[in-house]
Amino acid sequence: MTELPVPGRPARLPRRALLRGGAAAGALLGLAACAGLEPPAAPSPLPAGPSPLASPAPSSAPGDAPASPEAAAPPATPQGPAAELVRAHSGRPEVALTFHGAGTRALDRKVLEALAHGGAQVTVLAVGTWLAQYPDAAKMVLDLGHELGNHTWSHRTMSRLSVADQRTEIERCRDRIAALTGGPGAFFRQSAAQHATAEQLRLAGAAGYPRVLSYDLDSLDWTDPGPATVCAQLRTATAGSVVSMHLGHQGTLAAIPQILADLDARGLRPVTATQLFA
């Protein structure tokens, strides 16, 4: 018997129709289970408040310029003020020949090869602009058995610079060396001064250099006085001396054989600064 609809009351399906609908739904669920399908989950309730939007991950467009070597360099670990090294007191018959790293690549290679062939290992304090001009210079220094350090980015007179500019000179060269070699270099040396100031020691330590390499003997080769004068200056070196010299000068190249012969005659061995202060 069919039930007639009553005005104002929702229509009700016949019991037989409900049973047929339930059976059909059960059959569909059974087929889904056999096929390994899961019935759709009930929708999750909306959160009470608006959810924060996630920031999209940065992406590099195909036309983006590559990062500069300075930007790619790993950061150094900040430390307290660096210690200034002027000369060693180990008593060993050793001296450190340390070179301002600048000049032309061809002449610099000749100087470094002459030192290596003469059995000398030296420390090259590189100027950052030199490394920028000759990106393979760092590898050349290391491949010849020498040591690399930081001699500021552009060799400005640091005592005339603001603290911020001094920091930039140190850190920019550090980052260039690290990008080329994987490390910041063995030492920092201030530019245009024999000794570091307290501020420069603090900045060097903050840049990750525990030691600043100053010197006790100036070879004067940067004034181009001639090989004889440079050799005469080197004859005043004693055990433990740190000697300041320069790449990029023809007179320095000409003086190398005699310098090494004089050191050998006095029983002094030229080593890297790291070896001297070990």
What are these regions (language model features)?
Residues 71-169, 176:
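Active-site beta->alpha N-cap acidic-glycine motif
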Residues 35-43:
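Bacterial lipoprotein signal-peptidase II cleavage site
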Residues 110, 157-264, 268-269, 274-278:
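Catalytic domains of cell-wall/extracellular-matrix polysaccharide-remodeling enzymes
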Residues 1-13, 25-31:
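N-terminal secretory signal peptides
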Residues 46-54, 58, 63, 69, ...:
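C-terminal domain-boundary segment and adjacent tail
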Residues 15-16, 189:
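Short, cationic motifs built from Arg/Lys/His that form the positively charged side of catalytic pockets
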Residues 14, 91-92, 118, 144, ...:
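Residue-level preference for short coil/turn positions at secondary-structure junctions
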